[in-house]
Amino acid sequence: MDIHQFFLGNAFDAHTYFGAHVTEQGVVFRTLAPNAAAVDLIWEGGDWEPIPMQRIHDGGVYELTVPEAVAGQMYKYRITPQNPDGDIIDHCDPYGFGMELRPNNASIIRDLSSYTFHDKKWLAQRGNHRKKPVNIYEVHLGSWRTNPNDPNGWYTYEEIAPKLVDYVKKAGYNYIEFMPLSEHPADCSWGYQNTGFFSPTSRYGTAHQLMQLVDTCHQAGIGVILDFVPVHFAVDGYALNHYDGT
């Protein structure tokens, strides 16, 4: 990512830079907190003891590489505001790729590179789909079907994939639009109050399972539209609200 273009508002790949990324050197954590006095990483592998992050850019970018961190571990950012009377708050990662199931709210390190898609045929034909009629089936994943074997009634992304694809194909649809799947605090909502913008809600599984759902749709000739609402964010204190103390 070009950091200069990011601050100009022109970087569309910020998720590849910010967040927690698994590398050969360990996990690299980066977050943006321009008005913070200090940012610490706290994570389960370090017994949740604060580790200072380094401010690497005048715009407020903080970074830390943890060699022993691995995918699947939980973490948060502990942000100290400049105001001495302000509260020191532990926040989830706005760019994280995974979060705990509510009411817990730690971010989870995910390695998205380990999934291999099998949708080359769909991708090769995708450009031609704009010339064809579009019939979109909008669905709220959590209420579309009830799983009698789950205490919350939810199917995982992986479990619901064949059921949903079969229904959509029989009904004559060629696209599925998923109502927001980003992490959100309330079960009763449609998902429009985000806490983890790049974290698929853990109600239905992991990012890899969501990737498998999309892959299954594509292999069946079904396009996927994700309802992504970055302008709606929850006011919960652990999320983006007052993230750097302002």
Protein language model regions, located:
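The feature marks proteins involved in alpha-glucan
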Residues: 1-24, 47-48, 56-138, 143-152, ...
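Structural beta-strand segments of beta-rich domains
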Residues: 25-29
